[in-house]
Amino acid sequence: MKNTDTREVIMISIRLSTKNLQADYYPFILEPEARHLFLKELASHFTARTDLLDIQQHLDEILLTLDGQTESYTFALTLPRLISITLDTCNACGKNQQWFRSLSACIAMDAGLSRPIRLFISDTIPPIIQWTGLHADRVSTLTQEMAAGNSPSCLITHALYKRLSPSIQSKYATLYYIRHICCYCAEL
């Protein structure tokens, strides 16, 4: 892997959580189905986009890696609204199938330089991709803390904040420090 593969990226973590709507209902088998449905619906928002570099799901977390071109920042900031629409669709589907669960999500976004490291195992298994830098770790840490109810459900790091235009920065005026990570959220 050459150092020339280093590029500006936007790393986004979406951490899903479920809430029981009925006290005596324990649908352990349905949570993977709900996550699959969410991921399928989310992927539909990216079909016409060329800036999605990678998407990975790890149980209740989805990591998106977008190319850090200027228009990707604008799109990334619309993701909370798109995720809300996706959650509404999934929850309506779950209600129709009597899952008695509701999905919610926490979203964290970071930006910076990164490059993909590919691990090839065999010809039949797609390569495993890891991204250099701390961006995936930071957004994952943030959404883990957010899922515990310690902050708003959508945060951007200072690294992403400083790449935004002043007019957009003014919308993200509330400052948070979570695990020594400087973050902002939109005014409520």
Stretches with model-predicted labels:
Residues A23-Y25, I117-S122, S167:
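Short, conserved acidic/polar surface loops in the N-terminal third of protein domains
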Residues M11-S13, S104-A108, L155:
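Short glycine-aspartate micro-motif
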Residues T50-S72, C90-T132:
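Catalytic core of nucleotidyl cyclases, primarily class III adenylyl/guanylyl cyclases
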Residues K2-F75:
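Catalytic NTP-binding/metal-coordinating core of nucleotidyl cyclase/transferase enzymes
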Residues A111, S122, T132-K162:
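Catalytic/regulatory signature loops of cyclic-dinucleotide turnover enzymes
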Residues E41-H45, L82, T89, C93-N96, ...:
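Amphipathic alpha-helical regulatory segments at dimerization interfaces
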Residues A76-I83:
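Short amphipathic alpha-helices in soluble, non-transmembrane regions
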Residues M1, M146-L188:
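Intrinsically disordered, glycine/charged-rich C-terminal tails and inter-domain linkers
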